[in-house]
């Protein structure tokens, strides 16, 4: 959470093996401090083999007009699972992968806020000072919209297996589905 306060430090959180590879290549040639957040779990591939990382630019993975899920890192796969469940119920949500948290892609966030009017952020991190806070700040200052944050609620975490911790802290596709339904 306090990491976003560091000046000139660039923050990235890849969602799969291909994005991790592209980000590491970018970081290797970066002049200045970088922070790359990696999870412990193996995750399914989200990006195609010809994916090219673009510094500071989020990626729209699924289109939708009812709500937007903005996510990062290992929560991308969980968010895509939620998107599929919602789609089966006739709810069309946009899913955006913000692999670069600092600097944040204000353009993709504001486009989503203007087009869907409702945002759910999902992160495997403290919502205070993390992705949810950064997205909320962009929206509040430029295009006020409803934002709900899913993540760790400013408490000390526990140790354990990632799957158990995700369930403990509500970092599940079912929680995302419930949150989206509560705001549309």
Model-derived segments and spans:
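Single conserved hydrophobic/aromatic residue that forms the stacking wall/gate
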Residues: 1-10
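Conserved glycine-bearing catalytic or ligand-binding loops at nucleotide- and phosphate-handling centers
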Residues: 14-28
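Mid-sequence acidic-hydrophobic segments that form the walls
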Residues: 7-8, 26-30
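Thiamine diphosphate
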Residues: 30, 34-184
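Acidic-residue sensor for enzyme active/binding pockets
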Residues: 2, 19, 123-124
């Amino acid at each position: 959470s306090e990491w976003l306060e560091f000046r000139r430090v660039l923050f990235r959180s890849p969602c799969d093996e291909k994005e991790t590879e592209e980000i590491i290549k970018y970081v290797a040639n970066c002049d200045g401090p970088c922070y790359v957040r990696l999870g412990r779990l193996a995750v399914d591939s989200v990006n195609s083999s010809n994916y090219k990382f673009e510094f500071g630019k989020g990626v729209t993975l699924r289109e939708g007009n009812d709500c937007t899920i903005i996510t990062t890192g290992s929560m991308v796969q969980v968010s895509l699972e939620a998107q599929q469940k919602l789609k089966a119920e006739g709810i069309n949500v946009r899913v955006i992968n913000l692999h670069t948290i600092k600097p944040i892609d204000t353009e993709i966030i504001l486009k989503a806020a203007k087009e869907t009017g409702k945002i759910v952020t999902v992160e495997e991190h403290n919502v205070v000072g993390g992705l949810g806070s950064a997205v909320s700040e962009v929206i509040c200052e430029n295009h006020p919209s409803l934002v709900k944050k899913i993540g760790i609620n400013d408490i000390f975490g526990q140790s354990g297996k990632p799957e158990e911790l995700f369930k403990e802290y509500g970092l599940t596709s079912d929680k995302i589905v419930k949150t989206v339904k509560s705001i549309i």
